[in-house]
A protein has these predicted regions:
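N-terminal, non-cleaved signal-anchor transmembrane helix
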Residues: 1-112, 289-293
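Loop-to-helix entry region at the N-terminal start of transmembrane alpha-helices
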Residues: 98-110, 157-178, 218, 262, ...
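Faces of alpha-helical transmembrane segments in polytopic inner-membrane proteins
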Residues: 117, 141-149, 169-184, 188, ...
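Cytoplasmic-entry segments and transmembrane alpha-helices of multi-pass inner-membrane transporters
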Residues: 121-156, 181-189, 196
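Membrane-interfacial helix termini and adjacent extracytoplasmic/periplasmic loops
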Residues: 138, 150-181, 185, 203, ...
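Glycine-rich helix-loop "coupling/hinge" segments at transmembrane-helix boundaries
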Residues: 158, 235-270, 289-293
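Transmembrane alpha-helices
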Residues: 173, 205-239, 261, 265, ...
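Short cytoplasmic-facing helical segments at TM-TM junctions of multi-pass membrane proteins
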Residues: 179-227, 240, 247-251, 290-291
Length: 293
C-alpha cells in the first residue's frame, strides 16, 4: 500500500538534468555572459578570464624599458658633460657601439661553444653506464670556474698568445659548469616511471631520451643556458687584458687615464647588457618550455 506522493515540481525545457546536478551548469557553460540565468554567469567567468589582460604581462616589459631608459639617460649625461679630448674620443658613439658589439660577440660565441660542449656531455653523463665518471668530470669543470678568471686569461695568453680566440677559450673554461650541471640535474630529476613507460610501449633508448627525458628536462637546461649567458657577459670584460676587445676596453682605459666618465660608462653598459640578456633568456625560457610544465 502506497502513501500519497508529493507533488512533482513543474518541469520545463530549461532543466535537462536533476536539480543541483552538473547538467545545468554544463548546459549554460556555452551561453554568453549575462545570459542563461544565475548559473550561466558563473560558468562563463573562467573563459572570459583567459582573455582578460593581466598585470603580469605588462610587468614583463618593465625591465627592458628601465634598461633602455637608464642607458639613454647616461649617454645623454655623457654627451652634455664637459669632456676633455681623451674622454671625448673614447666615448664617441661609434667607438662605444663597436666595443658593445665586440662584447656581444665574445658573450655569444663563448656561450655557443659552452653549449656544444656541456649539453652533449651532460646527456652522456646522465646515462647509467657513464655515471661513475660524473664526479671526475664535474671536478674538472669546477676547476675552470673556481680558478680566478684573470689568472686563467693570463695563463692562456702566455701559452697561446693574445687575441679574441684566447679570450674565448678562457670564457668557455669558465662557463662550462652551470650548463653541464643543469643538464645533469634536469635529466636526473625525470620520473623513472615515465621512462619505463616509454620503454614499455616499444621506444628505443634514443627515442625515450628525445621524446620523454629532454622535453621534461628543458626548463632546467634553459635555466642553465640563461645563467651561462649572464656569466659570459659579465666575465667578457677581462678580454681587454689580452687585447680581446669588448667593453672592458672602456674600463681599462678609464682606469689607466683616470677618466671617471669613461670607467663608469664601461661598467654601466656591461651591467645593462647583462640585465638585458637575462630578460631575453627569461622570455626565451617561457616560450621554449614544453606546454604543461
Amino acid at each position: 500500500m502506497t502513501g500519497p506522493s508529493a507533488p512533482s515540481p513543474p518541469s520545463g525545457p530549461s532543466e535537462p538534468g536533476p536539480v543541483g546536478g552538473p547538467a545545468p551548469a554544463a548546459a549554460n557553460a556555452g551561453a554568453p555572459a549575462g545570459a542563461g540565468g544565475p548559473g550561466g554567469g558563473t560558468a562563463v567567468e573562467p573563459r572570459t578570464a583567459l582573455h582578460a589582460p593581466t598585470g603580469r604581462s605588462w610587468r614583463a616589459f618593465l625591465q627592458p624599458l628601465a634598461i633602455i631608459a637608464i642607458g639613454g639617460l647616461w649617454m645623454l649625461y655623457v654627451e652634455n658633460s664637459d669632456l676633455d679630448s681623451i674622454a671625448a674620443r673614447v666615448l664617441a658613439p661609434d667607438y662605444v657601439a663597436q666595443k658593445t658589439w665586440e662584447h656581444i660577440e665574445l658573450a655569444v660565441v663563448s656561450t655557443l661553444l659552452v653549449l656544444v660542449i656541456a649539453i652533449p656531455l651532460g646527456v652522456l653523463l646522465s646515462r647509467s653506464w657513464a655515471r661513475p665518471a660524473t664526479p671526475l668530470v664535474l671536478a674538472i669543470a669546477n676547476i675552470g670556474q673556481s680558478a680566478p678568471a684573470i689568472g686563467v686569461v693570463v695563463l692562456l695568453a702566455v701559452t697561446f698568445g693574445i687575441g679574441f680566440w684566447t679570450a674565448i677559450v678562457a670564457l668557455v673554461a669558465y662557463g662550462v659548469l652551470p650548463a653541464l650541471r643543469n643538464t645533469l640535474v634536469g635529466l636526473q630529476q625525470v620520473d623513472p616511471t615515465l621512462t619505463d613507460a616509454g620503454r614499455g610501449i616499444g621506444m628505443s633508448a634514443a627515442r625515450v631520451l628525445a621524446r620523454v627525458e629532454l622535453p621534461l628536462a628543458t626548463p632546467v637546461i634553459l635555466a642553465g643556458i640563461r645563467t651561462t649567458l649572464v656569466l659570459m657577459v659579465g666575465t667578457a670584460s677581462i678580454a681587454s687584458f689580452i687585447s680581446g676587445g669588448g667593453l672592458g676596453d672602456l674600463i681599462t682605459t678609464g682606469v689607466s687615464t683616470q677618466r671617471t666618465p669613461v670607467l663608469l660608462t664601461g661598467c654601466i653598459l656591461i651591467a645593462l647588457l647583462a640585465l638585458l640578456i637575462d630578460w631575453l633568456g627569461g622570455m626565451a625560457a617561457r616560450l621554449l618550455a614544453p606546454k604543461g610544465l
